[in-house]
Curated annotation (Swiss-Prot):
(6R)-5,10-methylene-5,6,7,8-tetrahydrofolate binds at H51, D169, A263. It comes from Cupriavidus necator (strain ATCC 17699 / DSM 428 / KCTC 22496 / NCIMB 10442 / H16 / Stanier 337). It comes from the Bacteria. It is found in: Cytoplasm. Its main location: cytoplasm. The lineage of its organism: Bacteria, Pseudomonadati, Pseudomonadota, Betaproteobacteria, Burkholderiales. The active site is at C146 (nucleophile). This is Thymidylate synthase. DUMP binds at R21, R126, R127, R166, S167, A168, D169, N177, H207, L208, Y209. Belongs to the thymidylate synthase family. Bacterial-type ThyA subfamily. It catalyses: dUMP + (6R)-5,10-methylene-5,6,7,8-tetrahydrofolate = 7,8-dihydrofolate + dTMP. One of its GO terms (biological process) is dTMP biosynthetic process. Homodimer. GO terms for molecular function: thymidylate synthase activity.
Length: 264
């Protein structure tokens, strides 16, 4: 994951110091892109240990269409707890928009089901898109989507994905987001009978929080290790039927975890 370390170093050394919504303060750049060949290994950061369980369960939770943290908590995942209300609700966040986007005439659009059907029927389409950025629903969301929009692309029998992330917490959030959408690309490829291609990560406001600088220096001093390979142990009937136990990262090794506070 040299690309990720280069990205972090670039923002740390050349970013602009800015205020932010949380009051923490950031150093940021506007606009950055990284490309990962998924055939060369699964793009998971190795210069610190990631909680892979949280990444996998969160993606499965999105695909369920859920917006309540209780299911995550039942599986030992607490990454959304800071934003949930007393009943565990987050408002119409990712899962709701992916699976049940409301229309003016009272219907709901399942973007994920439609996406799978489109990839199978018309792989050359330039409309293989899912958006979580629903302007009408944003006031009711506890946290508006950071990873807001993604598009798939098929060429030479390979499925690639590009994510646009409008707000990118480089130290804590981006490693999760890269791994999550790389995993989704593998799942989509399996479901549509394609091989994996590239995952392209594109960021808007790309920032390091001021209270992460010490951790950033620690991570930049570490040498990245070889990337693992993702193994999907079975092919479920649909994109919605995967389980946590279906995934294995063969050869995953990492440096020790680096703790850092979350800006809420």
């Amino acid at each position: 994951m040299k690309q990720y370390l280069d990205f972090m170093r670039h923002v740390y050394e050349h970013g602009t110091d800015k205020a932010d919504r949380t009051g923490t303060g950031t150093r940021s750049v506007f606009g950055y892109q990284m490309r990962f060949d998924l055939r060369a290994g699964f793009p998971v950061v190795t210069t610190k240990k990631l909680h892979l369980k949280s990444i996998i369960y969160e993606l499965l939770w999105f695909l369920q269409g859920s917006t309540n943290v209780r299911w995550l908590q039942e599986h030992g995942v607490t990454i959304w707890d800071e934003w949930a209300d007393e009943n565990g609700e987050l408002g119409p966040v990712y899962g709701s928009q992916w699976r049940s986007w409301p229309t003016p005439d009272g219907r709901h659009i399942d973007q994920i089901t439609d996406l799978v059907a489109q990839i199978r029927a018309n792989p050359d389409s330039r409309r293989l898109i899912v958006s979580a950025w629903n302007v009408a629903d944003i006031p009711r969301m506890k946290l508006p989507p950071c990873h807001a929009f993604f598009q798939f692309y098929v060429a030479d029998g390979r499925l690639s994905c590009q994510l646009y992330q409008r707000s990118a917490d480089i130290f804590l959030g981006v490693p999760f987001n890269i791994a999550s959408y790389a995993l989704l690309t593998h799942m989509m490829a399996q479901q549509t009978g394609l091989e994996v291609g590239d995952f392209v990560w594109t960021g808007g406001d790309c920032h390091l929080y001021n209270n992460h600088f010490e951790q950033v220096q620690t991570q930049l001093a570490r040498e990245p290790l070889a990337l693992p390979q993702l193994k999907i142990l079975r092919k479920p009937d649909s994109i919605f039927d995967y389980r946590y136990e279906d995934f294995e990262l063969a050869g995953y090794q990492s440096h020790a975890a680096i703790k850092a506070p979350v800006a809420v």
